[in-house]
Amino acid sequence: ETDCFRSREYDEPRHIAIHPNNRYAYLINEKGNKMTYFGFDDVNGKLLPRQNLPTLPETYTGEGQASASLLDKNGEILIGSNRIHESIVLYRIDQETGYMKELGYYPAMGLTPRFITFNPDYSRFYMANEDSDTIIEMKLDSEQGRMEYTGRVIAAESPVCITFR
């Protein structure tokens, strides 16, 4: 049997990232502009909602469309992307409890950051900016909890997904 949960009206759940320990899950809500943390009861197969944090800055009053959620290799940093706000948000994950703490926002350096991913060895982070036809390369400093732009911009017509082989 598969567990299900009722999201808040108009939140529109979009992507979920599972922590490497398989006990925590992080769901980004497209219209609600929230990241929801769930504990996962793997014995009973239940998702237990525990925390909601905004994906947009508190002072931002415009519309938003959250698009993707992604964890770093060790499950220490959670990243969410915001399409209309043209940004990403970083959260630190408490490894004992799974709770999130907002670390800050970074400009997407382009329009409509639709997809985010790491390269296979997690040394670089990539953001596909659909409406500016660019892929932005960044480097995550997990220890400090911040992103650094590498200066590399890859031209790509309307990128919406990135895969590595």
Label the predicted regions.
Residues 1-5, 47-55, 100-107, 147-155:
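Beta-propeller fold detector
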Residues 2-56:
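Acidic, glycine-rich loop-and-beta core segments that form the ion-binding/anion-interacting portion
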Residues 7-23, 55-75, 109-122, 153-165:
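Beta-rich, blade/repeat-based domains predominating
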Residues 30-31, 40, 83, 130-131, ...:
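Short loop/turn segments immediately following the C-termini of beta-strands
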Residues 38-47, 91-98, 138-146:
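Short loop/turn segments immediately following beta-strands, especially the blade-tip
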Residues 89-137:
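C-terminal hydrophobic structural anchor segments
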Residues 124-158:
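Internal helix-turn-beta structural module
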